[in-house]
Amino acid sequence: MIEKNVVILRIETGNPSGVVRYIQMLTEGMKHMNGIKVHIICLNTSLIFPKFEVTEDRIIANIPYPSKSKPLRNEIYWLTKYFNVVSDLISPYFKNRKQLIWHVQELLLVKLADILKLSLGGHILTHLHIIPWKLSLEYNESLFKKQYSQWLNNTFNLINENQLEKIAYPLSDRIICVSYSAMKHIISAYGIHPDKISVIYNGMDDTGITLQERKSRTPEILFVGRISREKGVICLLNALNKVASRGYFCKLKLVGQCTGYMSSHIRKAYKQLKIDILGTVSFNELKELYTTNTIGVIPSLHEQCSYVAIEMSMFGMPMIVSDVDALSEMFEDEVNALRIPLVFDEDFGLELD
């Protein structure tokens, strides 16, 4: 039997993310699969020189990636030039490998996968971890409001202007989505045939997880994720303000990456609330938080198949989640979570109800 060689293409920025978690789960799981070898091509934003680790079973290539370079960020021509250089560096290590599967974790890298495919053969498998147009909520809210308004009316002339998506989906031999909402996006906005798409939810190994009794008298609410508006943190804080004004008090723990500006804003604007901003913590510390806090909250304004949601569920946390995207698929209201609807106004934007 000819061995398959799965080559994961990813970008490393040093920040924790669902993509990083997925790759950890995938590589660990693949160790137990016969006939499959897993390799990694990583474009690393912190490197100056390329670094290769080569064994008989595995190739790990770390390539410098100047992500802040304006030509690479703004022009497909220069990005393609860069990818050609990366291909020239990498190709000698894979020239004798057969049954290559270029497993792309970022839409940006599909063009690199296509260059490698033309040189070395194989197939391109694109893994869609996000719905790209919804990211505009974070960097261009005015655009997001227009896109969301059109999406509600099943029109896509603003949504389908994403150049990366226009390039990536036709070049992909197969596309994996982590939710049916993402699959619907690809079909509706870009006309990709459903037969080309598979939906595979994220998953985790639950070995070694022990459920514990929660003993805290004061309700302790746990949020895990990037501490930002799009993750619903401001909506959560506003809701807790209303609860406090009615004489009910709880403690909120915010775990995850947080900018200095956001941290300062939270401490000033919500100083009447009991809030601990813990920053990024290890998974062992997360386990402790999952088992000792009263309620897990995922108030995201958009969300795919969240590993935090999976982890909280595995540890038996009572949960409140926003009724959006993959969270709507993962949780049944008043069965395994309380689902909070979203409301949209063209002037005020998207909020939790």
Regions inferred by a protein language model and the residue ranges of each:
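Short His-centered aromatic/hydrophobic patch
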Residues: 104-109, 128
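Nucleotide-activated donor-binding/catalytic signature segment of Leloir-type glycosyltransferases, i.e.
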Residues: 263-284
